[in-house]
Amino acid sequence: MLQQKFPAAAKSFFAIDNFTKNLKQDFILSASNEEEALQLYKQALFFSSNENIYYFPSYNTIPYDHTSPNANILSRRAETLIKLTTNNSNSNKLLITHTANLLNKLPPKDFFSKYFLKLSPKMKFTTDELAMFLVENSFTRNASSIDVGEFAVRGEIIDIILSGPKAYRIHFSWGYIESIKEFDIDTQISTKSCRELIISPANEIVLNSETIGNFKNNYLRNFGVNHTDNALYEAVISGRKFTGYEQLLPLFYDSCSNLIDYLNDPIFIFDNLSKKAILEFEHSYNDFYSARSEANKLKFNSFYPTLSPTSLYFTASEITELLEQKNNILLTFENSEQASLIKNIAATSFIEKKTVFDKLFEVIKANSHKKIIIGSSVLSSFERIKSIIQNYEYKYNEINKLDEAKASIINVAIIPLNQSFYTKEYLFITASELLEEKPSSTNTNKKLKNILLELDNLAEGEFVVHKDHGIGQFLKLEALEIKGKPHDFLKILYAGNDKLYIPVESIEVIKKYGNDNAELDKLGSVSWQRSKAKLKKRIKEIALHLIQIAAKRKLNSSASVEFDLEEYDKFCANFPFSETEDQLIAINDIKEDLRNGMLMDRLICGDVGFGKTEVAMRAVFMVAKSLNEHLPQVAVVVPTTILCSQHFSRFIERFKGFGLNIKQLSSVISSKEAKIIRSELESGKINIIIGTHSLLHKNIKFFNLKLLIIDEEQHFGVGQKEFLKSLKSSSHVLAMSATPIPRTLQMSMTGLKELSIIATPPLNRLEVHTSVMPYDPVIIRDALLREHFRGGRSFYVVPRIKDIEDIAKQLKQIVPELSYKIAYGKMTPSKIDEVMSEFYAGKFDILVSTTIIESGIDIAEANTMIIHNADMLGLSQLYQLRGRIGRGKMRGYAYLTVASHKKMTSHSLRRLEIIQNSCALGSGFTIASRDMDLRGFGNLIGEEQSGQIKEVGTELYQEMLEEQIAIFKDESIVSEQPFIPTINLGLSVFIPDNYVADAALKLGLYRRIGNLSNEIEVETFKDEMIDRFGLLPIEFNNLLDIVKIKLLCFKLNIENLDSGDNGFVIKFYKNADMTDKILKFVTTYSNQAKIKPDNKLVYIKKLVDKNIIVEANQLLWNLSEV
């Protein structure tokens, strides 16, 4: 075995270098995970123009899964195997793959040589022959083909979608192929013609008489004759695919090959991580085999017989032994000098008071003997780098392949490099390192609103509110022609079947109503304006009250909190994990609050398990160890006994050795001990108290309460919150929640309460896989056993106490081999504590409980949750419950079950849709905001306001309240934008379907566009779109240009801007006094500018589409400058 040292970032470059120099030698480049494999492949395609570079993807399912892998992955794997088999050229081949794929048993190497089809125009072939070939090769026939592995027959035309996905349309005529063309899957319109088409099977399993015969014999040999009622068996022998049948692949063939067999005595290039992946995958498939075998002992899963691991996979020892017989290259990485390349540039530029790019160009000059490549993995960074190079007056060469690179010039390319490196001939610099910036100071609330606007988009049939016309119903997004050009409009229905069309660039006038029941307003009626005016007066009173509450707290000055920095650093060093960026930002926010001389009032909004408690502990340390306070005290208030016990244990462990007296007060504490604790709180002997509602009594007196921490504040009742208010008036306050109550979120969004967001997940955290489904004992058994056999435990949540015993009986039947215990709120606190302690210790498998576990449970080994009758729970409850699992490195699985016969309300359906679709890590804030939409803002200041909200809807109410608070803070702010400029330039204005196909996402983007308030935001949004979707089509670019023009028109009091072939017509807002400016403009541009009798301004200019935006901007600029 040859060992070579190389920079880690250059792994693919090294492989290509060897591949190019050894023209008769095949290579396998291995990766330690699937993400790395795909990145190495993309890099290799840049480094080499050789067509014999292949990528073999991994299944996106777990071993012994009952679902089939993604269709594109199945097709790509089969296509790669065929290319490896049928490539008859004398040139060598390079295969890039995740090392675990070497253990897969694959069809025999020679099998695929006869199962591919090469088609070309004028070839003799019929539609029937091709359709038969496709069915035998695992394609699915549908009315229209929209996914990989599908085909459609329409007379003499066959449409087929291959891996990629790439779609082809084959025309036949009189038994011959007339033409082969690519077509667009979304529009179904043909594009370019093809000279040749090679069709590979859509799956590694080909269903023909030979493979079906093998399956019958091998099935009989492995599982016996009892298969007459097995749906999988019946489907296969009938020549039909069955979901998950890929787990029986070896049964279809006489023998199997491994991936190495498909190449000619290859050299294996690997590193220690990719080598280790072989053993990890073997361990994984053995674990899943054990789980599946146990599940199959009862006949719940009889559709899926289980092959032994040695039948389905090669062993690690077999593959390792095979590799040892070959010439292998083990890469060891030397990173120190190379990895610091960009860091050194940044450091020296700071010392020499130069920009990073000044120093970079000096480095480039010093390396003029090398070919310089600056690579970016995203289009927006790529465009930005080109712009910077131009600003420095350098020339650049845009390249797609490394062999296009030139010396004595900067080469720029799209290439997914994650670190800069250099070789004798090349210097590779990554744009991501060059452009790396500190966290943006962009307003947090603004960013969050952008996310919410995009996620919480309008749905057809939903009630909306127009600022001027009242409540209507959104029908659809409709394209209308304006001056012969397509333009997207929102179509809104009003009473009397009246319709209102709103151009997408003015979408901000529409707000969601937020309720399923509403009475439509009549267009042109004065009743809406009257209702809105009355509400505005009431909102002014509410806003003033909220301002007074916040101002009163700010008037209560507080001494700056000072603490021993060396001792604090020691406390921080004891934290066993690396802080995430968001945690560090939140901690710094708290430091500033405690030192600014005013009482802190901050909300930490962070997803479950994202480290809010550690942030709170830092705050506790700062205050409890304050050097300028006499016996400062900290109270941590939590909603449940379970959470109280858990926090108490953690605080004791975390603060060990720092001389702080920590106690807990909850229902598990005896009355005698509680009396002592109350006395010590009053005397100042206790530094930190952690308690439930037991702390919220008038008989609790503190000696010197300086910090109040409210954990999961959404769980406290109105009376408890009133008592908390009395504590808060003279103490620093830190509230924490993943899904804050609407009132707290409302105050944070309006700037009355400071807000810190922890949205960065801890390292290696995986999102929880969430399924909403009818109650199914087969799936539940499978889920519980799978968790058990990977060494874990499960939660079974039952909303109602009366249903718990029935569920317990069902569990005895479904999983008799697993143990369970029950916990619910009416049990004695000591009994709940006993059950929870046993569950923590792993003494039983399933905890059957009510929702009492939604806060505070943190068990790394418990990663499966079944929620019974999930439709009975609120959105935030569902989210908090799901947050109990997947808190370690194992993926969590949540199954939200509903009764199959039950008809759910629209609100229940929507809750379940939201929780299923909000799987991404960090969705808590979104959930809280969606909860606002589902149930309104609730009780903002102690008086019921749902009636007021119902008048105008949740979004407009929120906007009106925010606006009024802003006015009280700054009297110069105009109370309401008096008009919305209308821009009509006769251009195509819409987001094309071939750019953003998803209609819901498109509406979300339109809503975000309506929220853009200045040119910088528009440009930032444009960069984001390029990064996500690619270069902007002209129609979308027109839309964003018009938004910028609209913003400028508002500043200039222009209500309408219209264009025609011969120039522009401007109408000014009626209340705007623009007389002097207009007269001055007409005088300055007397040859082109005229005033009409109706006071409209006419500007004469010959216009064409390609320059109309430029001319409009120039006109507005000239008008602003006079």
From Swiss-Prot:
Residues 779-933 form the Helicase C-terminal domain. A motif (DEEQ box) lies at residues 711-714. ATP binds at residues 606-613. Residues 593-758 form the Helicase ATP-binding domain. SMART domains: CarD_TRCF (SM01058), DEXDc (SM00487), HELICc (SM00490), TRCF (SM00982). CDD domains: DEXHc_TRCF, SF2_C_TRCF. One of its GO terms (cellular component) is cytoplasm. Keywords: ATP-binding, Cytoplasm, DNA damage, DNA repair, DNA-binding, Helicase, Hydrolase, Nucleotide-binding. One of its GO terms (molecular function) is hydrolase activity. SUPFAM superfamilies: CarD-like (SSF141259), P-loop containing nucleoside triphosphate hydrolases (SSF52540), TRCF domain-like (SSF143517). NCBIfam families: mfd (TIGR00580). Couples transcription and DNA repair by recognizing RNA polymerase (RNAP) stalled at DNA lesions. Mediates ATP-dependent release of RNAP and its truncated transcript from the DNA, and recruitment of nucleotide excision repair machinery to the damaged site. This is Transcription-repair-coupling factor. It comes from Rickettsia conorii (strain ATCC VR-613 / Malish 7).
